[in-house]
C-alpha cells in the first residue's frame, strides 16, 4: 500500500482520471475497486486513486489502517454482512479514518472510499 501514497500531500483532484472507488463527496478521499475472489480481496494499485489533499498524518494512518480494513471486509464477506449479490454499504472506522464499502451488486468487486473521520461539533 505504501507505494501508492507518495505525493498524497500534493494537490491532485484526479478529475482527469477514472474514480474506481465508492462514490464519495468527502475530500480528501482514497477510493479503490478491490477484486473479490471468494472471501478474499485483492488490491490493485491501478484501480485506486486519491482525491484531495491528505495530511501527512492521515496518509500515514491510511497506510497503517488499510491492511486492517481489508481483513475486516474479508470477514464481512465470510459472515455475509457484505454480499456480492446485494447492494449494502458497510462502514468501518480505524485510526481516525472512515471506510465505506459496498459490492454494488457486482459479483467480483468491492468498492470502497476511505476518508478522515469528520470531527463532531458540540
UniProtKB/Swiss-Prot annotation:
List of residues binding Mg(2+): 86, 88, 102
GO cellular component assignments: cytoplasm
Coiled-coil spans in chain: none
A Pfam family hit: CbeA_antitoxin
Zinc recorded as keyword: no
InterPro entries: Antitoxin_CbeA (IPR009320), CbeA_sf (IPR038025)
Alphabetized UniProt keyword annotations: Cytoplasm, Magnesium, Metal-binding, Toxin-antitoxin system
UniProt keyword Metal-binding, yes or no: yes
Cofactor(s) for this UniProt protein: Mg(2+)
Binding note for cofactor: Binds 1 Mg(2+) ion per subunit.
Molecular function terms, GO-annotated: cytoskeletal protein binding; metal ion binding
Induction (free text): Expressed in mid-log phase at considerably lower levels than antitoxin relB.
GO biological process: negative regulation of cell killing; positive regulation of cytoskeleton organization
Subcellular location(s) per record: Cytoplasm
Record's function text: Antitoxin component of a type IV toxin-antitoxin (TA) system. Antitoxin that counteracts the effect of its cognate toxin CbtA (YeeV). It does not bind to the toxin but instead binds to MreB and FtsZ (the toxin targets), enhancing their polymerization by forming higher-order bundles; it is probably retained in the MreB and FtsZ filament bundles. The mechanism has been proposed to require intergenic DNA, in cis, between the cbeA (yeeU) and cbta (yeeV) genes. The intergenic region was not found to be necessary in another study.
Subunit description: Homodimer. Interacts with polymerized and monomeric MreB and polymerized FtsZ.
Family that this chain belongs to: Belongs to the CbeA/YafW/YfjZ antitoxin family.
Stated name of the protein: Cytoskeleton bundling-enhancing antitoxin CbeA
Gene behind this protein: cbeA
Amino acid at each position: 500500500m505504501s507505494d501508492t501514497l507518495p505525493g498524497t500531500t500534493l494537490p491532485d483532484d484526479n478529475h482527469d482520471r477514472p474514480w474506481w472507488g465508492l462514490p464519495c463527496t468527502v475530500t480528501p478521499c482514497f477510493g479503490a475497486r478491490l477484486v473479490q475472489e471468494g472471501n478474499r480481496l485483492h488490491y490493485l494499485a491501478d484501480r485506486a486513486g486519491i482525491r484531495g489533499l491528505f495530511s501527512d498524518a492521515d496518509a500515514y494512518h491510511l497506510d497503517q489502517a488499510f491492511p486492517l480494513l481489508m481483513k475486516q471486509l474479508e470477514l464481512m464477506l465470510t459472515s455475509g454482512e457484505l454480499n456480492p449479490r446485494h447492494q449494502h454499504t458497510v462502514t468501518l472506522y480505524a485510526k481516525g479514518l472512515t471506510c465505506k464499502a459496498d459490492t454494488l451488486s457486482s459479483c467480483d468487486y468491492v468498492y470502497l472510499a476511505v476518508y478522515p473521520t469528520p470531527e463532531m461539533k458540540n
